[in-house]
Amino acid sequence: MAVLADIKGVGLGLKRELIPQIQRLFNDKDVPDSKIANINFVEIAPENWIGAGGKASADLAWFVERYPIACHGLCLSLGGPDSLNVDFLKQVKQFLSANKIPLYTEHLSFCSDIQNGKAGYLYDLLPIPFTEEAVKYVAQRIRQTQDLLGQRIAIENTSFYVSAPISSMAEIDFLNAVLTEADCNLHLDVNNIYVNSINFGFDASQFLRRIPGERIVYSHIAGHLQVDAGLLVDTHSENIIDPVWALLDEAYQLFGVFPTLLERDTSIPPLPKLMIEVNKITDIQSQYASNNSPAGQYQSGVRSRP
């Protein structure tokens, strides 16, 4: 069974169109192992796989046998006004156990609302107001989630485009307060830091330096769409730009090497082109191979809380 420490090195988001490409290269004896050797783990959204049967179930089983898997949720709505979806979390718990998946993460956002007494999904990830009240509310829901799952989760810093007018805290202060109050781990999204820094005019490096590095379990890096000079959209559809690569490099300098996953959700190129960015992450990590444990918190590339 995979354990948290197996999530290490470089990962790739597992999209349906990539499955046959990875399987073909993995099974082709005439293809050098180095073609996909730098894919050390994969990530899936549990919502897309819970209850899957037939070929989808067989594909998942194939990856479970060959790769450590991280689950990155989409619809828990940690900041939502409706009650936490306990039935869904029970499904997640069973899914994690059945597929030997050691890690579950979610977005620090909300994607549900209540109208006329009925809860419904908004199909987008929206920012939580950055207030002390929201810190306590979200942290309680994270603790409840951890209790129901019987394990720690990690929350991801999200991109957003409109800040709530009632916010009274900076994003980094809100994030750190939630992490402390909930005592959970951090799923660090490097591209989201950069996107928000451009959209809201703060220094991405200063934000990064205030991250509690000992809570990082793994990170995302991705491309984004530039709409205009002051507006970036986190589309996961483009190649990663140099300032985002530089921010990842800076994060490794600050915190040591942590597992990092390439996100590509739309306009997905053939696997060999994706491997160019996967291999670049590996190259950057190799520059800091002797800096895996600056504070003694890393274990096999994954930090754990004492």
Annotate each language-model stretch with its function.
Residues A2-F26:
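Boundary/entry segment of secreted carbohydrate-active catalytic domains
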Residues K8-L14, N40-I44, I69-H72, Y104-E106, ...:
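Hydrophobic faces of well-ordered beta-strands that scaffold small-molecule active sites
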Residues E17-P20, A45-A56, S77-D87, Y161-M169, ...:
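Acidic-and-aromatic substrate-binding clefts and catalytic sites of carbohydrate-active enzymes
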Residues Q23-A37, G53-C71, D87-P102, Q146-L148, ...:
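Acidic (Asp/Glu)-rich catalytic clusters
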Residues G51-G53, S83, L125, P129-E132, ...:
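Gly/Pro-rich active-site loop or hairpin
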Residues N85-N185:
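Active-site acidic/histidine proton-transfer and metal-coordination neighborhood
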Residues Q146-L231:
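Acidic/histidine-rich catalytic cores of soluble enzymes
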Residues P270-N291:
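C-terminal helical cap(s) of enzyme catalytic domains, especially alpha/beta-barrels
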